[in-house]
Amino acid sequence: MSKPLPRKLFVTTALPYANGAFHVGHIMEYIQADIWVRFQRMQGNEVHFVGADDAHGAPIMIAAEKAGLTPQQFVANIAAGRKQYLDGFHIEFDNWSSTDSPENHELSREIYRRLRDDAKLITTKSVEQFYDPVKEMFLPDRYIKGECPKCGTKDQYGDSCENCSAVYAPTDLKHPYSTLTGATPVRKSSDHFFFRLSDPKCVAFLREWALDGQRLQSEVANKAKEWLEGEGGLGDWDISRDAPYFGIEIPDAPGKYFYVWLDAPVGYLATLKNYFDKTGRDFDAFMADPSTEQYHFIGKDITYFHTLFWPAMLKFADMKVPNNVFVHGFITVSGEKMSKSRGTGISPLRYLEIGMNPEWLRYYIAAKLSSKVEDIDFTSDDFIARVNSDLIGKYINIASRAAGFITKKFDGRVATDWATSDDAFLSRLRNVASEIQALYDQREYGKALRAIMEQADAINAYVDANKPWELAKDPAKEAALQEVCSRLLEAFRILTIYLKPVLPALAKQVEAQLNIAPLEWHHIITPLPHGHQINPYVHLMTRVEPKMLDALFDMPALVDATVGVPTSPSNKDGDTNGNGHAIESIAPEIKIDDFAKIDLRIAKIVNCEHVEGSDKLLRLTLDVGEGRMRNVFSGIKSAYKPEDLIGKLTVMVANLAPRKMKFGISEGMVLAASAADEKANPGIYILNPWPGAEPGMRVG
């Protein structure tokens, strides 16, 4: 097996917006890209894997103002928290920068000048914008909501629809409102700069680039074709925003700034340039090299920007266009979209803080991923079963059944001068290398791991057939015992090579255990030498326990989502109540129509009992006056005894969709209060109406 010719790869993930911590969707994407990068490096390829914070835009400007910080300080505070997530999940970017970097200012302006002066693709138009008469500012797209003009979905942002992926002008929204004040915005005119995406040369290029059948995933190419050939074709792209705005000022246009979606993807190039400048590499030469390959891993919600605007910008700025854009779906939890308020989210930081092995999640996500644009679903039972069965029961089990005998009986030395008649066992394992290699390269991680686990099954069958524990009982069979266990360790070594892109930390432990240098792909054909001495066996990985998943979802700040307590303990405004305790900041205003969607009802607690296996939940049987009882799980066990609640009245959200939990179906949400500062006041206070209220009465 010869090493392939090295490739030169430039790889990015979508830039996270610098207004909050990473969520599990970010981590999923970073794991997907990190696996691919690690695999490519194991092939001997040159890979530059870079990321950055998306730092510009009105949301950050407004959030910084509210926090009493400059936008730069606000972004720096967010960036300071990134490392614990990336290190925690073994995600290794070569560089992490910001779109507010000098490199991004320079490159964004240069690309704009080329589009304006050379390609003649920048034009100016007078635009009617929404203006908030209360806030006295033009409203950014994300601070306007309304009904999608294409599909009619309500509460969509002012630039694109999350339901149908349509892109439109904010003024196209039906029934718009300001998310800052709730006011109905008024229209005002302003001169804006546009990138002429509708120009025939842009359209011709995008047809070739997006629809050639050699690049984009079929689902993505079909969507691009729909956009290119839809009624009206491609529209020109508004790339400017009016002051006040935190961003990059447009050359020769005082008071005008690049829309964040222009400079954000340029951040891919800027963070690579920043990295090359720090390491003494020539950025311009690297990007001009025709052998350089450029790849972007992104979520399906930003496909339009990355498959139309971005490649067209680069093409007509005379810069390298992406070789491909790899689009993935979302991650759901038990079939539901992630939501803090419903308790269906997974906190990556919580996962790490409670001591869960990050490589469990890396493996589980990889096992679910394919090259298709499909959502992946996380369920606790499947997570436990897959990790314990595959990693512990199949993979780790091989080493645990062989290494101990080698250490105890043979001074840790393996015997590899085997009879050629038995070579088929390891040959079969090595012969799947090219198949697994191709699957990794195609991002078919789920298929790759299934193929690897099939080999693990065959190895465990070899264990059962040769029974080393029986051989160890007979002194006359020591040579056979050493050979069997040595073969098993060699098989384990090869499996570790196959799994190393997914499980880098575990692979490092195995390398130390086997007393070998870091494993590369080409080491598959090079066995441990005869007489090689391994180190004493130490336990490599523990099993997942159900109580860990309970702890993951029974987050104190969420109280299992059946209690309406704050989802953030922070108080950035420093407000206090009459007792001097910090209170959570008031949420943005909503319209009365939004509140009217929530059906709050008086409920009688007919029965209440502990939930076996949960430290936080109580099971409530509620009468809401509808002729049947409801089952609701509530995370209030720390505050109430079941017998103290039976017969009491409370308030519940009656029209919340039933949620499937580990312990059963929860048919609503009981309301309760808790302090933002749990140390000052750790209590949970269930709502209890005054005498006279009856089950079924509506609260409003």
Curated annotation (Swiss-Prot):
The keyword Zinc-finger does not apply. Its EC number is 6.1.1.10. This is Methionine--tRNA ligase. Binds 1 zinc ion per subunit. ATP binds at K340. NCBIfam families: metG, metG_C_term, PRK00133.1. Zn(2+) binds at C148, C151, C161, C164. The gene is metG. A motif ('HIGH' region) lies at residues 16-26. Homodimer.
